[in-house]
């Protein structure tokens, strides 16, 4: 317990120094920060918590959550650069702590500590955490979703997500309604058990999907598409490894291209996909996501006669996928640019 408290105190201290120091001491940067902050300020002055505007014109770039957070901050601190950025900084401190608890549950407290320390000191994350943009909010809620998932699975499996020793006490397994609750025996120290999907108990899955609902309010469809794709791929790989251990799959032979094709067919078979969908209650989960996010989308659509929905989904989502926007035209060998930028942005 003392180790956990020391780790968390150290991480909070480092994160607060990185994300809060001189937060309002410089002007809003680039185009996104001024537009987002001004949009929030206009809503604040009107007392409007529903329709985002910039220069009194409808702003369809991003959903409402980043503006709600700004409105709360403006109410407490007044309209300023500091208050426009405060929510992003606070949530980035939260993401740092979530990464610690995610890492210590997956591996160990030491690994979780260094993973979160590396995250909060990386250049791009520290920049995002000091900007009045929705990115820090999206990162926080997706990280929260996966932290909930990992901790619930570990709770169902006596405090252990994937086998081996953990730094937490075993807990009671989930009760009735879970098809996997009684399938895992108590493990001896150092044993290895393959990861299993979230149990068939939708109540335990609720925190995961509630967090995704807020991610959708932060940045739209990417808030559900990204975590759903990650979780689905994890489950499909897990099921394939399980079937290999149980010798349900035929050995793959032949040249590399044939082995690769056979592996993909095994990985993305319909039975395995349906098992993954049922395993984490994607049907019920989609309903939970809608319950969190849909009321505002419906309300803003009605208030603007559908103009906000058309602008956001058709222009800023579908349009961005089909054509260049906001001077992001790309250039030959642009992938090399991202190879360099990714390495620099993750420094040190």
Could you describe each region identified by the protein language model?
Residues 1-348:
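Membrane-integral, polyisoprenol-dependent glycosyltransferases
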């Amino acid at each position: 317990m003392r180790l956990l408290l020391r780790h968390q105190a150290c991480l909070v201290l480092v994160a607060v120094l990185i994300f809060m120091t001189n937060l309002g001491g410089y002007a809003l940067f680039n185009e996104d920060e001024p537009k987002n902050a001004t949009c929030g300020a206009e809503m604040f002055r009107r007392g409007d918590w529903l329709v985002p505007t910039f220069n009194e014109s409808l702003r369809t770039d991003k959903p409402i959550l980043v503006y709600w957070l700004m409105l709360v901050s403006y109410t407490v601190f007044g309209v300023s650069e500091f208050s426009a950025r405060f929510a992003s900084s606070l949530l980035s401190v939260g993401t740092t702590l979530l990464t610690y608890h995610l890492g210590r549950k997956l591996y160990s407290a030491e690994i979780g500590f260094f993973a979160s320390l590396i995250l909060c000191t990386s250049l791009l994350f520290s920049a995002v955490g000091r900007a009045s943009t929705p990115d820090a909010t999206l990162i926080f809620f997706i990280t929260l979703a996966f932290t909930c998932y990992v901790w619930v699975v570990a709770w169902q499996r006596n405090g252990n997500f994937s086998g081996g020793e953990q730094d937490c006490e075993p807990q009671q397994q989930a009760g009735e309604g879970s098809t996997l609750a009684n399938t895992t025996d108590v493990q001896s120290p150092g044993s290895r058990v393959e990861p299993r999907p979230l149990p068939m108990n939708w109540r335990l899955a609720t925190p995961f999907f509630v967090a995704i609902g807020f991610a959708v309010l932060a940045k739209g469809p990417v808030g559900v598409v990204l975590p759903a794709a990650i979780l689905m791929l994890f489950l499909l790989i897990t099921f394939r490894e399980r079937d290999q251990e149980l010798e349900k799959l035929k050995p793959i032979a032949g040249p590399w291209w044939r082995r690769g094709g056979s592996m993909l067919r095994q990985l993305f078979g319909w039975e395995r996909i349906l098992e993954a969908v049922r395993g984490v209650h994607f049907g019920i989960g989609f309903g939970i996501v809608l319950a969190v996010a849909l009321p505002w989308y419906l309300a803003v659509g009605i208030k603007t006669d559908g103009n906000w929905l058309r602008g956001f989904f058709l222009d800023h989502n579908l349009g961005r996928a089909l054509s260049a926007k906001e001077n992001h035209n790309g250039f030959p060998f642009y992938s090399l640019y991202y190879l360099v930028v990714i390495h620099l942005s993750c420094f040190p």
